[in-house]
């Protein structure tokens, strides 16, 4: 997606941001249903924080169990993933949790490849995915360190 900016400078076009995160939110809901992270005939989701065209953090829940939400993350620079809602009080804490989780997942994958050389052709795919996890974790961690970007309101 081409980044659209207002004439005033670095502020992303609010309509473009809204279109971007709504499309991504639909994809997140489909993935959470497919993976079994949420279940039910009616699933709801609410975007909580976005870093435009890079990262979306949302709450996703079954309409029947609204108090049992999960934090979900998706975007250009990160994998689609989720954690239990109880693991973070807000989107920033969720981002920190995802960052740590992905570092640990990447380490575990690298260890698996070293311990099981018989994985053959899958080694390259595992290593590539591990690198993607680390890159996403590092990017997300850098974002959590920036005070300014956590105060923005989502475009309605």
Regions found by a protein language model. Name each.
Residues 50-83:
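Short aromatic-glycine-(Arg/Gly/Cys) micro-motifs in beta-strand/loop hairpins
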């Amino acid at each position: 997606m081409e980044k659209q900016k207002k004439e005033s400078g670095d502020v992303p076009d609010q309509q473009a941001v809204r279109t971007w995160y709504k499309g991504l939110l639909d994809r997140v809901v489909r993935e959470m249903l497919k993976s079994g992270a949420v279940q039910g005939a009616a699933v709801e989701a609410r975007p909580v924080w976005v870093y435009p065209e890079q990262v979306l953090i949302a709450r996703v829940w079954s309409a029947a169990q609204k108090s049992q939400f999960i934090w979900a993350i998706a975007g250009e620079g990160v994998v689609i993933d989720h954690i239990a809602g109880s693991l973070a009080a807000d989107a920033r804490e969720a981002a920190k949790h995802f960052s740590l989780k992905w570092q640990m997942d990447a380490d575990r994958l690298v260890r698996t490849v070293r311990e099981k050389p018989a994985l053959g052709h899958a080694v390259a795919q595992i290593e590539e995915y591990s690198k993607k996890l680390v890159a996403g974790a590092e990017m997300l961690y850098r974002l959590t360190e920036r005070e300014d970007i956590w105060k923005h309101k989502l475009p309605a």
